[in-house]
Amino acid sequence: MEYRYKNIYLGETIEEIFSELNNSNTEYKRSTFVLLYRPYENIEVYIYLEFGKVRLMKIFDENFQIDNTLKVGIALTDEIVNRYDLYYDDFEEVYLSKKHKELVVIVDLADNIIGFSFHLELVGDEAFATDRIKNYLECKNLQDIYGSLYWSKTLDANIEKREIYGQLDNYKFTFDIITRDIKSIQNLETGEFVKISLNK
């Protein structure tokens, strides 16, 4: 099964999609550290900045279909449930698939299909905000100190400048939004730059 809507696909990197992002179609969601990209009226694309990839897509386009039997606007029948090995998730109030882990079927109260989600589950260490190094002043990439930055609740992003920001103690960290590599570390008390990347 292909997890794609027009030219956007699940797992696509921010580098591949970045030229399409702008302030009118993309919004930074601080609480989840994602860019919410709306390239078309009936789709939401979630770019997880920690990984730099599309990890969630929500599609509500009335003309969208995965194949001839699974499409928006039709009733969810027993045949479809069995074919895709679907089961109802009471917490999320959607149908998940045992056969296609990335597929979510969204239905209304009458069990008519109103949309789909494609998602990549977080596995292993991805599911937890952790650090890879102890001394955050030695970080080379956002993932090195992501846990500390996440828990500090200081993460921010700027699409126009192509940067991700975070603060620990009195240090401001600036990362490239595409590679997530460190661009600079600034001591906010002195204004001095502790580290500036060669790529800046």
Q: Residue ranges of each PLM-predicted region?
A:
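Acidic/histidine-rich, surface-exposed loop or edge segments in extracytoplasmic proteins
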Residues: M1, M57-D61
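A cross-family detector of function-defining hotspots
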Residues: E12-L56, K71-K200
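Short, recurring structural edge motifs at helix starts
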Residues: E2-N7, F64-T69
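Short glycine-rich, polar/acidic loop-and-turn segments at beta strand-coil junctions
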Residues: F51, D61-N63
